[in-house]
Design a protein with these regions (language model features):
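Extracytoplasmic ligand-binding site segments that recognize negatively charged/polar headgroups
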Residues: 164
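N-terminal organellar transit peptides
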Residues: 1-157, 168-314
Length: 314
Protein backbone atom coordinates (compact mmCIF):
# COMPACT_ATOMS: atom_id res chain seq x y z
CA UNK A 1 0.00 0.00 0.00
CA UNK A 2 2.99 2.32 -0.44
CA UNK A 3 1.67 3.38 -3.84
CA UNK A 4 -0.54 6.44 -3.28
CA UNK A 5 -2.40 5.66 -6.52
CA UNK A 6 -3.27 2.06 -5.63
CA UNK A 7 -6.95 2.83 -5.21
CA UNK A 8 -7.11 4.35 -8.66
CA UNK A 9 -5.27 1.35 -10.09
CA UNK A 10 -7.72 -1.08 -8.52
CA UNK A 11 -10.69 0.90 -9.80
CA UNK A 12 -9.21 0.93 -13.29
CA UNK A 13 -8.77 -2.84 -13.26
CA UNK A 14 -12.31 -3.36 -11.99
CA UNK A 15 -13.70 -1.03 -14.64
CA UNK A 16 -11.64 -2.75 -17.34
CA UNK A 17 -12.91 -6.18 -16.22
CA UNK A 18 -16.49 -4.91 -16.31
CA UNK A 19 -16.05 -3.50 -19.80
CA UNK A 20 -14.46 -6.77 -20.98
CA UNK A 21 -17.34 -8.77 -19.53
CA UNK A 22 -19.88 -6.48 -21.20
CA UNK A 23 -18.12 -6.87 -24.55
CA UNK A 24 -18.08 -10.64 -24.16
CA UNK A 25 -21.79 -10.69 -23.29
CA UNK A 26 -22.56 -8.41 -26.23
CA UNK A 27 -20.66 -10.67 -28.62
CA UNK A 28 -22.62 -13.74 -27.43
CA UNK A 29 -25.85 -11.78 -27.69
CA UNK A 30 -25.04 -10.82 -31.28
CA UNK A 31 -24.06 -14.41 -32.06
CA UNK A 32 -27.33 -15.88 -30.76
CA UNK A 33 -29.35 -13.21 -32.53
CA UNK A 34 -27.57 -14.10 -35.76
CA UNK A 35 -28.26 -17.81 -35.21
CA UNK A 36 -31.96 -17.24 -34.56
CA UNK A 37 -32.36 -14.88 -37.49
CA UNK A 38 -30.58 -17.37 -39.77
CA UNK A 39 -32.83 -20.19 -38.59
CA UNK A 40 -35.96 -18.10 -39.11
CA UNK A 41 -34.76 -17.08 -42.57
CA UNK A 42 -34.10 -20.69 -43.54
CA UNK A 43 -37.52 -21.82 -42.28
CA UNK A 44 -39.31 -19.01 -44.09
CA UNK A 45 -37.42 -19.68 -47.32
CA UNK A 46 -38.09 -23.40 -47.01
CA UNK A 47 -41.78 -22.84 -46.35
CA UNK A 48 -42.06 -20.64 -49.43
CA UNK A 49 -39.97 -22.69 -51.82
CA UNK A 50 -39.07 -26.03 -50.23
CA UNK A 51 -42.21 -27.97 -51.09
CA UNK A 52 -42.55 -26.80 -54.65
CA UNK A 53 -41.82 -29.63 -57.08
CA UNK A 54 -39.80 -29.33 -60.22
CA UNK A 55 -42.88 -29.02 -62.40
CA UNK A 56 -43.20 -25.34 -61.50
CA UNK A 57 -40.11 -24.72 -63.62
CA UNK A 58 -40.99 -27.13 -66.39
CA UNK A 59 -41.78 -26.18 -69.94
CA UNK A 60 -45.28 -25.91 -71.32
CA UNK A 61 -44.72 -29.03 -73.42
CA UNK A 62 -46.23 -32.30 -72.30
CA UNK A 63 -44.18 -34.22 -69.78
CA UNK A 64 -44.11 -37.45 -67.80
CA UNK A 65 -44.69 -37.01 -64.08
CA UNK A 66 -42.37 -38.97 -61.79
CA UNK A 67 -43.30 -39.96 -58.23
CA UNK A 68 -40.85 -41.90 -56.09
CA UNK A 69 -41.80 -44.76 -53.78
CA UNK A 70 -38.73 -45.44 -51.65
CA UNK A 71 -38.06 -47.31 -48.42
CA UNK A 72 -40.44 -48.98 -46.00
CA UNK A 73 -44.11 -48.11 -46.28
CA UNK A 74 -44.91 -46.73 -42.84
CA UNK A 75 -46.60 -43.84 -41.07
CA UNK A 76 -43.20 -42.64 -39.81
CA UNK A 77 -41.99 -42.22 -43.39
CA UNK A 78 -45.31 -40.65 -44.43
CA UNK A 79 -45.12 -42.87 -47.50
CA UNK A 80 -48.83 -42.92 -48.30
CA UNK A 81 -49.30 -39.19 -47.73
CA UNK A 82 -46.38 -38.29 -49.99
CA UNK A 83 -47.49 -40.65 -52.75
CA UNK A 84 -51.06 -39.40 -52.73
CA UNK A 85 -49.89 -35.78 -52.62
CA UNK A 86 -47.61 -36.41 -55.57
CA UNK A 87 -50.43 -38.05 -57.53
CA UNK A 88 -52.74 -35.10 -56.89
CA UNK A 89 -50.09 -32.62 -58.04
CA UNK A 90 -49.33 -34.63 -61.17
CA UNK A 91 -52.98 -34.96 -62.16
CA UNK A 92 -53.65 -31.26 -61.55
CA UNK A 93 -50.87 -30.26 -63.95
CA UNK A 94 -52.42 -29.83 -67.39
CA UNK A 95 -49.11 -30.76 -69.06
CA UNK A 96 -48.96 -34.24 -67.51
CA UNK A 97 -49.27 -36.88 -70.23
CA UNK A 98 -48.57 -39.87 -68.01
CA UNK A 99 -47.34 -40.82 -64.54
CA UNK A 100 -44.49 -43.11 -63.53
CA UNK A 101 -44.16 -44.40 -59.97
CA UNK A 102 -40.50 -45.29 -59.50
CA UNK A 103 -40.64 -48.09 -56.93
CA UNK A 104 -37.85 -49.30 -54.68
CA UNK A 105 -39.41 -50.62 -51.48
CA UNK A 106 -39.47 -53.88 -49.49
CA UNK A 107 -43.07 -53.29 -48.39
CA UNK A 108 -44.59 -52.36 -45.06
CA UNK A 109 -48.00 -51.47 -43.67
CA UNK A 110 -50.95 -53.29 -45.30
CA UNK A 111 -53.26 -50.42 -44.32
CA UNK A 112 -51.16 -47.76 -46.05
CA UNK A 113 -50.51 -50.00 -49.05
CA UNK A 114 -54.24 -50.57 -49.47
CA UNK A 115 -54.91 -46.86 -49.09
CA UNK A 116 -52.53 -45.96 -51.92
CA UNK A 117 -53.86 -48.84 -54.05
CA UNK A 118 -57.40 -47.48 -53.74
CA UNK A 119 -56.26 -43.92 -54.51
CA UNK A 120 -54.44 -44.97 -57.68
CA UNK A 121 -57.51 -46.87 -58.86
CA UNK A 122 -59.74 -43.89 -58.09
CA UNK A 123 -57.50 -41.46 -59.96
CA UNK A 124 -57.23 -43.79 -62.95
CA UNK A 125 -61.00 -43.96 -63.22
CA UNK A 126 -61.26 -40.18 -62.90
CA UNK A 127 -58.49 -39.51 -65.45
CA UNK A 128 -58.53 -42.42 -67.93
CA UNK A 129 -56.54 -40.38 -70.45
CA UNK A 130 -53.48 -40.24 -68.14
CA UNK A 131 -51.84 -43.67 -67.72
CA UNK A 132 -50.08 -44.67 -64.50
CA UNK A 133 -47.14 -47.05 -64.80
CA UNK A 134 -44.78 -48.47 -62.19
CA UNK A 135 -41.07 -48.85 -62.90
CA UNK A 136 -39.33 -51.17 -60.44
CA UNK A 137 -35.74 -50.39 -59.55
CA UNK A 138 -34.04 -52.83 -57.14
CA UNK A 139 -37.05 -54.29 -55.34
CA UNK A 140 -40.82 -53.98 -55.20
CA UNK A 141 -42.00 -56.61 -52.77
CA UNK A 142 -45.07 -57.23 -50.64
CA UNK A 143 -46.75 -53.91 -49.77
CA UNK A 144 -44.91 -52.22 -52.61
CA UNK A 145 -46.31 -54.75 -55.06
CA UNK A 146 -49.74 -54.26 -53.48
CA UNK A 147 -49.49 -50.62 -54.59
CA UNK A 148 -47.91 -51.43 -57.96
CA UNK A 149 -50.71 -53.79 -58.95
CA UNK A 150 -53.07 -50.80 -59.14
CA UNK A 151 -51.12 -49.31 -62.06
CA UNK A 152 -51.84 -49.74 -65.76
CA UNK A 153 -48.54 -51.54 -66.33
CA UNK A 154 -45.51 -52.65 -64.33
CA UNK A 155 -42.02 -52.49 -65.83
CA UNK A 156 -38.95 -54.15 -64.34
CA UNK A 157 -35.27 -54.77 -64.87
CA UNK A 158 -34.33 -58.38 -65.45
CA UNK A 159 -32.55 -58.38 -62.06
CA UNK A 160 -35.29 -56.61 -60.08
CA UNK A 161 -36.85 -58.44 -57.14
CA UNK A 162 -40.64 -58.55 -57.27
CA UNK A 163 -43.52 -60.35 -55.59
CA UNK A 164 -43.68 -61.55 -51.98
CA UNK A 165 -47.47 -61.61 -51.93
CA UNK A 166 -47.84 -62.61 -48.31
CA UNK A 167 -48.23 -61.30 -44.78
CA UNK A 168 -45.79 -61.60 -41.91
CA UNK A 169 -46.11 -61.05 -38.17
CA UNK A 170 -43.11 -61.82 -36.00
CA UNK A 171 -42.11 -61.40 -32.40
CA UNK A 172 -40.29 -62.97 -29.47
CA UNK A 173 -41.23 -64.83 -26.31
CA UNK A 174 -39.34 -64.14 -23.08
CA UNK A 175 -41.00 -66.55 -20.65
CA UNK A 176 -38.06 -68.95 -20.26
CA UNK A 177 -35.55 -66.12 -19.91
CA UNK A 178 -37.74 -64.52 -17.24
CA UNK A 179 -37.94 -67.81 -15.36
CA UNK A 180 -34.16 -68.18 -15.35
CA UNK A 181 -33.77 -64.62 -14.10
CA UNK A 182 -36.39 -65.09 -11.43
CA UNK A 183 -38.68 -62.46 -12.92
CA UNK A 184 -42.39 -62.84 -12.23
CA UNK A 185 -44.90 -61.48 -14.74
CA UNK A 186 -47.81 -59.67 -13.05
CA UNK A 187 -50.51 -58.88 -15.58
CA UNK A 188 -54.13 -57.92 -15.02
CA UNK A 189 -56.65 -57.56 -17.82
CA UNK A 190 -60.34 -56.86 -18.27
CA UNK A 191 -61.31 -59.12 -21.13
CA UNK A 192 -60.24 -62.72 -21.60
CA UNK A 193 -58.20 -62.02 -24.72
CA UNK A 194 -56.80 -58.60 -23.89
CA UNK A 195 -53.28 -60.01 -23.36
CA UNK A 196 -53.23 -61.80 -26.72
CA UNK A 197 -49.73 -61.59 -28.16
CA UNK A 198 -48.08 -60.52 -24.91
CA UNK A 199 -44.40 -61.55 -25.28
CA UNK A 200 -43.99 -61.96 -21.51
CA UNK A 201 -46.79 -64.53 -21.14
CA UNK A 202 -46.81 -68.15 -22.38
CA UNK A 203 -48.15 -68.52 -25.91
CA UNK A 204 -51.48 -70.32 -26.17
CA UNK A 205 -52.73 -72.35 -29.11
CA UNK A 206 -55.94 -70.35 -29.23
CA UNK A 207 -53.93 -67.12 -29.46
CA UNK A 208 -51.89 -68.46 -32.36
CA UNK A 209 -55.02 -69.59 -34.18
CA UNK A 210 -56.61 -66.17 -33.78
CA UNK A 211 -53.52 -64.36 -35.03
CA UNK A 212 -53.31 -66.74 -37.97
CA UNK A 213 -56.93 -65.96 -38.79
CA UNK A 214 -56.10 -62.25 -38.87
CA UNK A 215 -53.07 -62.84 -41.11
CA UNK A 216 -55.12 -64.99 -43.47
CA UNK A 217 -57.71 -62.23 -43.72
CA UNK A 218 -55.12 -59.61 -44.62
CA UNK A 219 -53.48 -62.02 -47.05
CA UNK A 220 -56.80 -62.61 -48.78
CA UNK A 221 -57.31 -58.84 -49.12
CA UNK A 222 -53.85 -58.61 -50.69
CA UNK A 223 -54.60 -61.43 -53.12
CA UNK A 224 -57.92 -59.92 -54.18
CA UNK A 225 -56.27 -56.54 -54.78
CA UNK A 226 -53.59 -58.10 -56.99
CA UNK A 227 -56.20 -60.06 -58.93
CA UNK A 228 -58.28 -56.92 -59.34
CA UNK A 229 -55.32 -54.94 -60.59
CA UNK A 230 -53.61 -57.51 -62.79
CA UNK A 231 -56.67 -59.41 -63.99
CA UNK A 232 -56.19 -61.98 -66.74
CA UNK A 233 -52.49 -61.20 -67.02
CA UNK A 234 -51.78 -63.37 -63.95
CA UNK A 235 -50.63 -66.89 -64.64
CA UNK A 236 -52.42 -69.71 -62.83
CA UNK A 237 -49.49 -70.75 -60.64
CA UNK A 238 -49.94 -72.20 -57.12
CA UNK A 239 -46.84 -70.38 -55.87
CA UNK A 240 -47.99 -66.96 -57.05
CA UNK A 241 -49.54 -66.00 -53.71
CA UNK A 242 -47.27 -68.05 -51.47
CA UNK A 243 -44.97 -65.19 -50.47
CA UNK A 244 -42.18 -66.11 -52.88
CA UNK A 245 -40.19 -63.46 -54.71
CA UNK A 246 -39.01 -63.61 -58.30
CA UNK A 247 -36.48 -61.93 -60.52
CA UNK A 248 -37.78 -59.42 -62.99
CA UNK A 249 -37.19 -61.78 -65.90
CA UNK A 250 -39.28 -64.44 -64.11
CA UNK A 251 -42.07 -62.05 -63.18
CA UNK A 252 -43.06 -61.23 -66.77
CA UNK A 253 -44.19 -64.75 -67.83
CA UNK A 254 -45.96 -65.07 -64.45
CA UNK A 255 -47.98 -61.95 -65.23
CA UNK A 256 -46.62 -60.01 -62.27
CA UNK A 257 -44.97 -57.53 -64.65
CA UNK A 258 -45.59 -56.42 -68.22
CA UNK A 259 -42.11 -55.89 -69.61
CA UNK A 260 -38.67 -54.39 -69.23
CA UNK A 261 -38.21 -50.69 -68.87
CA UNK A 262 -36.58 -47.79 -67.06
CA UNK A 263 -38.05 -44.41 -66.19
CA UNK A 264 -36.51 -42.89 -69.30
CA UNK A 265 -37.55 -45.64 -71.70
CA UNK A 266 -41.13 -45.81 -70.41
CA UNK A 267 -41.47 -42.03 -70.63
CA UNK A 268 -40.07 -42.00 -74.15
CA UNK A 269 -41.52 -45.16 -75.69
CA UNK A 270 -44.73 -45.85 -73.75
CA UNK A 271 -46.06 -42.49 -72.55
CA UNK A 272 -44.49 -40.64 -75.52
CA UNK A 273 -43.44 -37.69 -73.35
CA UNK A 274 -39.68 -37.85 -72.96
CA UNK A 275 -39.35 -34.94 -70.53
CA UNK A 276 -39.55 -36.31 -66.98
CA UNK A 277 -40.61 -33.97 -64.17
CA UNK A 278 -40.30 -35.05 -60.54
CA UNK A 279 -43.51 -34.50 -58.55
CA UNK A 280 -42.28 -36.34 -55.45
CA UNK A 281 -43.07 -34.24 -52.35
CA UNK A 282 -39.99 -33.74 -50.23
CA UNK A 283 -41.45 -31.81 -47.31
CA UNK A 284 -40.01 -28.46 -46.28
CA UNK A 285 -37.31 -27.97 -43.66
CA UNK A 286 -39.87 -27.16 -40.99
CA UNK A 287 -41.65 -30.46 -41.62
CA UNK A 288 -38.41 -32.42 -41.48
CA UNK A 289 -37.31 -30.57 -38.34
CA UNK A 290 -40.61 -31.27 -36.59
CA UNK A 291 -40.54 -34.87 -37.70
CA UNK A 292 -36.99 -35.39 -36.50
CA UNK A 293 -37.62 -34.05 -33.01
CA UNK A 294 -41.26 -35.10 -32.75
CA UNK A 295 -42.23 -38.33 -34.44
CA UNK A 296 -38.71 -39.75 -34.53
CA UNK A 297 -38.39 -39.37 -30.77
CA UNK A 298 -40.79 -42.26 -30.21
CA UNK A 299 -40.21 -44.22 -33.42
CA UNK A 300 -37.81 -46.67 -31.80
CA UNK A 301 -40.31 -47.94 -29.25
CA UNK A 302 -43.14 -47.70 -31.76
CA UNK A 303 -41.24 -49.75 -34.34
CA UNK A 304 -40.37 -52.39 -31.76
CA UNK A 305 -44.00 -52.76 -30.70
CA UNK A 306 -45.06 -52.91 -34.34
CA UNK A 307 -42.64 -55.75 -34.94
CA UNK A 308 -44.14 -57.65 -32.02
CA UNK A 309 -47.83 -57.10 -32.66
CA UNK A 310 -48.49 -55.63 -36.13
CA UNK A 311 -48.64 -57.66 -39.34
CA UNK A 312 -46.47 -56.42 -42.18
CA UNK A 313 -46.62 -56.97 -45.91
CA UNK A 314 -43.03 -58.12 -46.31
Amino acid sequence: MNDPNWERSVLERVALAAVTEQRRARRWQIFFRFVWLSLIAVLVFSSLFGTKPEHLASSINGHTALIRLEGAISSENQTADYLIEGLDSAYQDSNTKGIIIQANSPGGSPVLSGRVFDEIRRQRQKHPEIPVHVVVEEVCASGCYYIASAADKIFVDKASIIGSIGVLSDGFGFTEAMAKLGVERRLQTAGNNKALGDPFSPSKESDQQWRQQLLNGIHNQFIQAVKQGRGQRLRNDPDLFSGLVWLGEQSIPLGLADGYGSVQSVARDVIKAEEVVDFSPRGDLADRFAKRFGVEFSSGVHSYLNQLFSPQLR
